[in-house]
Protein backbone atom coordinates (compact mmCIF):
# COMPACT_ATOMS: atom_id res chain seq x y z
CA UNK A 1 0.00 0.00 0.00
CA UNK A 2 1.13 3.54 -0.67
CA UNK A 3 0.41 6.11 2.01
CA UNK A 4 0.90 9.78 1.19
CA UNK A 5 -0.99 12.63 2.87
CA UNK A 6 -4.63 12.03 1.99
CA UNK A 7 -4.80 8.40 0.91
CA UNK A 8 -3.73 4.86 1.47
CA UNK A 9 -4.52 3.18 -1.81
CA UNK A 10 -2.89 1.00 -4.42
CA UNK A 11 -3.34 1.46 -8.15
CA UNK A 12 -3.00 -1.35 -10.67
CA UNK A 13 -0.86 -0.21 -13.60
CA UNK A 14 -1.46 3.51 -12.99
CA UNK A 15 -0.68 6.12 -15.61
CA UNK A 16 1.57 7.76 -13.01
CA UNK A 17 2.42 6.93 -9.37
CA UNK A 18 -0.19 7.90 -6.75
CA UNK A 19 2.29 10.36 -5.29
CA UNK A 20 2.35 12.37 -8.51
CA UNK A 21 -1.44 12.62 -8.61
CA UNK A 22 -1.39 13.85 -5.02
CA UNK A 23 1.46 16.31 -5.62
CA UNK A 24 -0.59 17.90 -8.42
CA UNK A 25 -3.63 18.17 -6.14
CA UNK A 26 -5.81 16.18 -8.53
CA UNK A 27 -7.66 14.65 -5.55
CA UNK A 28 -8.51 17.93 -3.80
CA UNK A 29 -12.21 18.65 -4.18
CA UNK A 30 -14.43 21.38 -2.79
CA UNK A 31 -16.46 21.73 0.41
CA UNK A 32 -19.59 20.89 -1.55
CA UNK A 33 -20.65 17.43 -2.68
CA UNK A 34 -23.22 16.77 -5.39
CA UNK A 35 -25.24 13.56 -5.42
CA UNK A 36 -23.90 12.92 -8.93
CA UNK A 37 -20.27 12.94 -7.76
CA UNK A 38 -20.80 10.97 -4.56
CA UNK A 39 -19.51 7.72 -6.08
CA UNK A 40 -16.18 9.35 -6.97
CA UNK A 41 -15.47 10.68 -3.46
CA UNK A 42 -12.91 8.88 -1.29
CA UNK A 43 -13.55 10.71 1.99
CA UNK A 44 -14.09 14.10 3.60
CA UNK A 45 -11.22 15.83 5.39
CA UNK A 46 -11.39 17.37 8.83
CA UNK A 47 -11.55 20.84 7.27
CA UNK A 48 -14.62 19.87 5.24
CA UNK A 49 -12.90 19.37 1.88
CA UNK A 50 -14.10 16.37 -0.08
CA UNK A 51 -11.31 14.18 -1.44
CA UNK A 52 -11.68 12.45 -4.80
CA UNK A 53 -10.70 8.81 -5.33
CA UNK A 54 -7.57 8.76 -7.48
CA UNK A 55 -8.36 5.20 -8.57
CA UNK A 56 -11.49 6.49 -10.29
CA UNK A 57 -9.56 9.38 -11.87
CA UNK A 58 -6.87 7.09 -13.25
CA UNK A 59 -9.41 4.60 -14.63
CA UNK A 60 -11.56 7.33 -16.20
CA UNK A 61 -8.62 8.96 -18.00
CA UNK A 62 -7.92 5.58 -19.63
CA UNK A 63 -11.60 5.13 -20.52
CA UNK A 64 -11.93 8.63 -21.97
CA UNK A 65 -8.72 8.25 -24.00
CA UNK A 66 -10.10 5.05 -25.58
CA UNK A 67 -13.44 6.75 -26.22
CA UNK A 68 -11.93 9.84 -27.85
CA UNK A 69 -9.60 7.86 -30.10
CA UNK A 70 -12.70 6.42 -31.79
CA UNK A 71 -13.12 9.87 -33.37
CA UNK A 72 -10.99 11.62 -35.95
CA UNK A 73 -9.01 14.31 -34.12
CA UNK A 74 -10.61 17.27 -36.01
CA UNK A 75 -14.05 16.02 -34.87
CA UNK A 76 -13.15 16.70 -31.22
CA UNK A 77 -13.83 20.12 -29.67
CA UNK A 78 -12.06 21.03 -26.42
CA UNK A 79 -13.68 23.86 -24.47
CA UNK A 80 -12.78 25.77 -21.33
CA UNK A 81 -13.70 29.13 -19.89
CA UNK A 82 -11.73 28.51 -16.69
CA UNK A 83 -8.52 30.56 -16.61
CA UNK A 84 -6.16 27.81 -15.48
CA UNK A 85 -7.73 25.37 -17.92
CA UNK A 86 -7.14 27.43 -21.04
CA UNK A 87 -3.45 26.72 -21.60
CA UNK A 88 -3.50 22.95 -20.91
CA UNK A 89 -6.78 22.46 -22.79
CA UNK A 90 -5.40 24.21 -25.88
CA UNK A 91 -2.13 22.29 -25.59
CA UNK A 92 -4.12 19.04 -25.46
CA UNK A 93 -6.21 20.04 -28.48
CA UNK A 94 -3.22 21.23 -30.51
CA UNK A 95 -1.18 18.12 -29.73
CA UNK A 96 -3.86 15.62 -30.74
CA UNK A 97 -5.11 17.75 -33.65
CA UNK A 98 -8.50 18.70 -32.18
CA UNK A 99 -10.43 21.98 -32.31
CA UNK A 100 -10.41 24.24 -29.25
CA UNK A 101 -12.45 27.13 -27.88
CA UNK A 102 -10.92 28.80 -24.83
CA UNK A 103 -12.18 31.80 -22.92
CA UNK A 104 -15.76 32.97 -23.45
CA UNK A 105 -17.76 30.51 -25.55
CA UNK A 106 -19.72 32.22 -28.34
CA UNK A 107 -23.42 31.28 -28.06
CA UNK A 108 -24.67 29.56 -31.20
CA UNK A 109 -21.28 28.21 -32.23
CA UNK A 110 -22.79 24.71 -32.41
CA UNK A 111 -26.44 25.56 -33.08
CA UNK A 112 -26.50 28.54 -35.47
CA UNK A 113 -25.29 27.60 -38.99
CA UNK A 114 -25.23 31.24 -40.15
CA UNK A 115 -22.88 32.27 -37.33
CA UNK A 116 -19.33 33.08 -38.39
CA UNK A 117 -17.17 30.29 -37.01
CA UNK A 118 -20.02 27.74 -36.79
CA UNK A 119 -18.60 24.25 -36.22
CA UNK A 120 -19.96 20.70 -36.15
CA UNK A 121 -17.86 18.60 -33.77
CA UNK A 122 -18.76 14.96 -33.08
CA UNK A 123 -17.68 15.03 -29.41
CA UNK A 124 -16.90 17.74 -26.84
CA UNK A 125 -14.47 17.88 -23.91
CA UNK A 126 -15.12 20.53 -21.23
CA UNK A 127 -13.08 21.57 -18.20
CA UNK A 128 -15.97 22.49 -15.88
CA UNK A 129 -19.70 21.81 -16.39
CA UNK A 130 -20.50 25.03 -14.51
CA UNK A 131 -18.25 27.42 -16.42
CA UNK A 132 -18.86 25.59 -19.69
CA UNK A 133 -22.65 25.26 -19.29
CA UNK A 134 -23.41 27.09 -22.57
CA UNK A 135 -21.51 24.63 -24.75
CA UNK A 136 -23.00 21.68 -22.86
CA UNK A 137 -26.51 23.03 -23.48
CA UNK A 138 -25.76 23.37 -27.19
CA UNK A 139 -24.20 19.91 -27.33
CA UNK A 140 -27.35 18.43 -25.79
CA UNK A 141 -29.50 20.20 -28.40
CA UNK A 142 -27.32 18.76 -31.16
CA UNK A 143 -26.99 15.27 -29.67
CA UNK A 144 -23.22 15.59 -29.26
CA UNK A 145 -21.65 13.49 -26.46
CA UNK A 146 -19.90 15.42 -23.68
CA UNK A 147 -16.78 14.46 -21.73
CA UNK A 148 -16.22 16.62 -18.64
CA UNK A 149 -13.62 17.15 -15.95
CA UNK A 150 -15.84 17.17 -12.85
CA UNK A 151 -15.12 18.29 -9.29
CA UNK A 152 -17.01 17.17 -6.18
CA UNK A 153 -19.62 19.93 -6.56
CA UNK A 154 -20.50 19.35 -10.22
CA UNK A 155 -23.79 18.04 -11.60
CA UNK A 156 -23.34 15.47 -14.35
CA UNK A 157 -26.86 15.24 -15.80
CA UNK A 158 -25.78 16.18 -19.33
CA UNK A 159 -22.30 14.64 -19.16
CA UNK A 160 -21.73 11.32 -20.92
CA UNK A 161 -18.28 10.58 -19.48
CA UNK A 162 -16.87 12.03 -16.26
CA UNK A 163 -13.21 12.43 -15.29
CA UNK A 164 -13.35 13.10 -11.52
CA UNK A 165 -10.71 15.69 -10.69
CA UNK A 166 -9.92 19.01 -9.12
CA UNK A 167 -10.93 21.17 -12.10
CA UNK A 168 -9.84 24.48 -10.59
CA UNK A 169 -6.15 24.05 -9.73
CA UNK A 170 -3.40 24.92 -12.22
CA UNK A 171 -1.27 21.83 -11.57
CA UNK A 172 -4.25 19.49 -11.43
CA UNK A 173 -5.57 20.68 -14.80
CA UNK A 174 -2.17 20.46 -16.45
CA UNK A 175 -1.74 16.93 -15.10
CA UNK A 176 -5.13 15.69 -16.34
CA UNK A 177 -4.72 17.16 -19.82
CA UNK A 178 -1.15 15.86 -20.04
CA UNK A 179 -2.18 12.32 -19.08
CA UNK A 180 -5.13 12.37 -21.46
CA UNK A 181 -2.84 13.53 -24.28
CA UNK A 182 -0.17 10.95 -23.54
CA UNK A 183 -2.68 8.10 -23.29
CA UNK A 184 -4.41 9.04 -26.54
CA UNK A 185 -1.08 9.24 -28.35
CA UNK A 186 -0.06 5.87 -26.87
CA UNK A 187 -3.26 4.25 -28.15
CA UNK A 188 -2.56 5.75 -31.58
CA UNK A 189 0.97 4.38 -31.48
CA UNK A 190 2.61 7.82 -31.37
CA UNK A 191 5.66 8.37 -29.16
CA UNK A 192 5.92 11.65 -27.25
CA UNK A 193 8.49 13.38 -25.06
CA UNK A 194 5.93 15.77 -23.58
CA UNK A 195 5.78 16.20 -19.80
CA UNK A 196 3.27 17.71 -17.40
CA UNK A 197 5.32 20.92 -17.35
CA UNK A 198 4.58 21.40 -21.05
CA UNK A 199 0.91 21.74 -20.15
CA UNK A 200 1.43 24.16 -17.29
CA UNK A 201 0.60 27.80 -17.79
CA UNK A 202 3.14 30.34 -16.59
CA UNK A 203 0.41 32.45 -14.95
From Swiss-Prot:
Extract one GO molecular function annotation from the record.
Answer: structural constituent of ribosome
- Cellular component, GO, one term: small ribosomal subunit
The family database entries (Pfam families) matched by this protein are listed as: Ribosomal_S2
For this UniProt record, the keywords arranged alphabetically read as follows: Ribonucleoprotein, Ribosomal protein
Q: Which GO terms describe its biological process?
A: translation
- Highest taxon of the lineage: Archaea
**PROSITE patterns for the chain:** RIBOSOMAL_S2_1 (PS00962), RIBOSOMAL_S2_2 (PS00963)
Record-linked InterPro entries: Ribosomal_uS2, Ribosomal_uS2_arc, Ribosomal_uS2_CS, Ribosomal_uS2_euk/arc, Ribosomal_uS2_flav_dom_sf
| Similarity comment text for this entry | Belongs to the universal ribosomal protein uS2 family.
- Matching HAMAP family: Ribosomal_uS2_A
Q: What is this protein called?
A: Small ribosomal subunit protein uS2
Record organism: Methanoregula boonei (strain DSM 21154 / JCM 14090 / 6A8)
